[in-house]
Each structure stands twice: as C-alpha cells, then as structure tokens.
C-alpha cells in the first residue's frame, strides 16, 4: 500500500526504515520501483510475520518498551484504511509482487532546503555542504571527524531524480487512486514540482479524495498555498520546531521566528491540521519545556489542543540523548516530569503521555558521547558565529558541570 523515498532517491520500507538497494536513480518508473525484488522480499517476510532488517530500529525500540513507529503506523493506518489494506493483501502474489498501485506515498523530494539543522547533513539539506567542510577543518574530535567525513561524501547526481519529468508524470498517473501523500525534504515548499503537483490535483478534481501531510520548517510557505487548503480532503502541516525563538534559530539555523509564528497562526485559522514536530536530541531535550510554555501562552484556537509530536534522534550517536551522562539525563527527566505534574490537570488524560514516554526513553542506557557532543557544539559555534552558552545558558551550565 505504501511507497517511500529518501532525498537521494533510495527506497526504504518507511520513513524511519533502513533503505533498500532500490533507488529512483536507477529505475525509470515508479511502478518498476514498486515491485523491485527487495520490496517484494520485504512484503513476503512481513506477511509471514518474519523480521526484516530494514525495520531494526523499531524492533530495538520495542525491546525498550517504546511504542515504535512501526506499531503506531500499523495501528493508525489499519484503522484509517482497513478495507484498502485488506484489498492490498488479497493482491499480493506468492513472490511478493503487488498487483495494485500504492495508495499512500511518502516522498522526500530532494535536499533543497533553506536551513541547516544540526541533526541534518548535506543529504537532507543543500545548505549544509559549506558548513560541513568547515566543521571538518575545525573539529578536534575523531568521532565528529569520522561522522562528517561520511556525511560530506555525497554524489549530487543522486538528487537528479526529482528533476526528471518521467517521475512526476508517473506520479500524476497514481493520483486518481491515491489516498494520502506525505511530502518532506529538504523543504517541500521550495519544490516547484510539488507546488505544480498540488495545483494539478486541484485542477483535475482529485484533491477532494487526497490527504496531504507536509513536513515543513514553517519559514517559506507561499501565500498561494493557503487558498488551496479547502480543496483537499485533509491537509496536515507538521511544523518542525526545536525550541522557542533563538533556541530554534540555533538548532534549525538560521530559522527566523517571525515567519514561523505567522504561518502557525495562518494554519490555525484554516481547516488544515497544524502540529508542531519536535526532534528530541541532545541539544533540544532539556528545552522542550520552553516551547510548550510558549505555545500555551499563545491564543491558538486549535493548535494548543494537539500535543506536540515528538520524533527521536538516534544518529549520530553524539546527538542521541541517551548518550548523555546520567547526571544530565536526570536533570532533563526531572525538568520534564515537573512540567507535566504542574500542567497535567489542565489538559485531557493522555495529553502528555508521549512527552513522559520520551523522558523515560532518554533515561535508557547508552554509550557516553559527551566529548563528541561538546566538540560538535564548539565547532558549530566557530563556523556559524553562534553561542551555545548564550542561547542555552541553563542547559550549558549543566553540561559544563558534567564535564568536571
């Protein structure tokens, strides 16, 4: 039922899975990729309830007692599309060939982006390449150097697939039977092809049966988009925000706060379902409370009714918050739990469940990566003339004390 791509055209089973060897760069048509041998083998394994290597991260989460992306998606999509999924299962041949087209797509359409978020790399953002070279010049840590030597080693031709007319023509052929599309990037609103496809779906009348979810940094949504929201069955906007104001500027550099807030309010006034997506990593975890407090202080009509969506950062290891020293993790956990205790009676039961689950997830043991993290922070500050100490004074003090 589902076909996903990463920015470089590689094809995973889903957005958090390990990529297969299949790629939009070595196939001409979407339907060829859809029944690639590796995807057929994955289908056979899943139908037979056999483990799949590409799903390893979710299996590890489940062993830690975490409600994994795999389980959440299985539950959610089966509730949403039970009849369609049952029909898809009836149309899988013994060799894994799927006889019907995908009806949900997750397309990360290239790496074109206007930001250079600290947990991204050139593969996810075209803006990262110059900073990546500079970090290699200033880092004094072998872990950071190895990490960025790997990240900077990309083939820019791997992003050419999003410029191929054949891909977007194939996409249009799927539109009549599509039910849901996820657009990420890069920054999807910078893609002319995506903007043209949105208009095509409206002009052909197919927008009425399609739900679209955008993963956006919220800085560059065109004014014309808001005029089309009502044309679709549903629009979801996941605003990737990792802190309040200057905190977000530091993490999602150089994201200005004013256009993000403006677009949050514009979304709140439409029928679009707007949510904030917060990436939980070593630099952001302590300050998620600040973003919650800011949002609570704002007179949003609908946005405050929806818990902040939390995404975990596992790689690189030095950005995985589980790799922080125990004393730092204790501080993070205490701050989050105190915040929940202070506010839980003002919100429905379950509103803070995900926040509490992530606070507990951080406490799980992992290798101490503080030296690499501190070197990465210092390297970023040198390259970008930013200041971690000034942006995160309280958290900076906690980290510095942990080093002594």
What positions do the PLM features span?
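Radical SAM enzyme [4Fe-4S]-AdoMet core and its adjacent flexible, acidic
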Residues: 1-28, 78, 108, 129, ...
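A generic structured-segment signal
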Residues: 31-32, 42-44, 117, 121, ...
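Non-transmembrane alpha-helical segments in soluble domains
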Residues: 31, 56, 117, 172, ...
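Distinct, well-ordered alpha-helical segments
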Residues: 193-199, 223-229, 287-291
